[in-house]
Amino acid sequence: IITGIPEVDQLYKRSLLVFALMTNKRTGALLAAPEIDEQFTRCGRYAYCWGRDAAFIASALDCCGLAEAVENFYSWAANVQDEDGSWQQRFYMDGNLAPSWGLQIDEGGSIIWGILRHYSITKNMDFLRRMWPCVKKGVEFLTRYVDNETGLPWLSFDLWEERLGEHAYSSAAVCAGIEAGARIAELLGESTELAGKWREHAARLREAIFRNFWKPEWNRFIRSIRVKLNGWGEEHTDRKVWLKVNEKSIARDYTLEDGTLDISMLGLSVPFGLYAADDPHMTSTADILERQLKVNGTGGLMRYEYDNYIGGNPWVLTTLWAALYNIERKDYAKAREYFWWAVRGTTDQGLLPEQIDKLTGRPAWVIPLTWSHAMFVLVLDRLLEAGELLLQ
């Protein structure tokens, strides 16, 4: 990609360098971020491969024409998949299991969704055939891991790895993964009965997502239900209950509904496509998300209301996520505003951080974050495709 805009072209080249350095050429794993601080006071201990981050990163690699690296990653993912079809939280680059505190069901859905996305770009049927055993096991697990009362995926941690519950974003990822699996089965000429069963499950899940997460009185989606709240501080919810969890009378915070505004709710539309960007349910949700999560002065968007991780700064990937959504909504001016905010948030070495300090406006915490660079490439690719990349 060459745009003729120096800042953009330089950041694109830096992103290619980051992708190369964060890819294990022997195993195919994709590193979330390097560890640069032995005392862990300025970094987040991110030197692992997460299926979630990697699915977004692989999508960006495809935009860069790096198909071999993408296929190497998905081959790695197939090798580390559990026998029951699930994927654990995170791994070392050699495929060994890293320290974990719970299943994050969106990762499995994201990996299967990403496999189909790669095929849609490359049309590599051999790749699809190699992935079929992994896809079949993965989708079968996703269709089993169900809360029969809600119809949603059973309890798992959210994409921020903080709260155990049933989440809108995670449910959307699972739905997209199941639908992708059904399409892969059809493309390979596998059992039409199996593909049909999966599509029926995805259709029921779509209904459950709307039934559980749409709040007509608020005219927007909520992020989670049946949530065990994290123990790091007071949570902001109107429906909090205390539950005794053992005979020693230890109790924990739970909430029946978590209406906290969270940028991940955009995932219902981008990238997972359950709702069109101009669907009224999405536009009303997105409008309040962007309004309430914007950080005054510094700009950019926070992850969610009341976020207190590293002080609650705006994140690069969240702001670029909103850019992707606005491109689909054809609000290119807003998308460019978010895009250029991220471009101007690089370090002196041209690297994108995880966050921008809300007080100083300087790059903060993990540097570089591979997911941030991936989102930059994804937004750049879509703006160029739309012919809407203008010099700011």
For each predicted feature, which ranges?
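Aromatic-rich carbohydrate-recognition surfaces in CAZymes
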Residues: 46-148, 171-178, 372-383
